[in-house]
Amino acid sequence: MTVETDQETMLTHYITCALWSSMDNADESGGDPLDQNYGPDDLHPDTRAAMLADCSAFLASFESEIGGLLEQAGHDLWLTRNGHGSGFWDCGRPWSKDAAKKMTDAAHALGESDLYIGDDGLLHV
């Protein structure tokens, strides 16, 4: 695989997790998960670019720890950076304790990132 392919694979799963774990806030209860009404094509181009930059930088920093587990890394990066109660450190994950700690710390350093529906109908961070 190429670096670009690896980045896109990780990004695809990062976006999938973001849509699955984010709500549309359409009502007082939080509404529906975004993935029920939105998909990757609904991301604003700047949002996709920002997500790709985050995934690419993370992958470059932890390529040896991630290995071929790009799908899991994308998923865990979104969950961990946003404090969803699961992520790199969670039991049953394929990472060593040391790698999980390093990746968790790096994900937290990125800060939280929330998707929202803009006035243009597209998803933004």
Briefly describe each language-model feature range.
Residues 1-68:
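Long, contiguous N-terminal structural blocks used for assembly/anchoring
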Residues 122-125:
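C-terminal edge-of-domain segments
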Residues 53-120:
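Amphipathic protein-protein interaction modules
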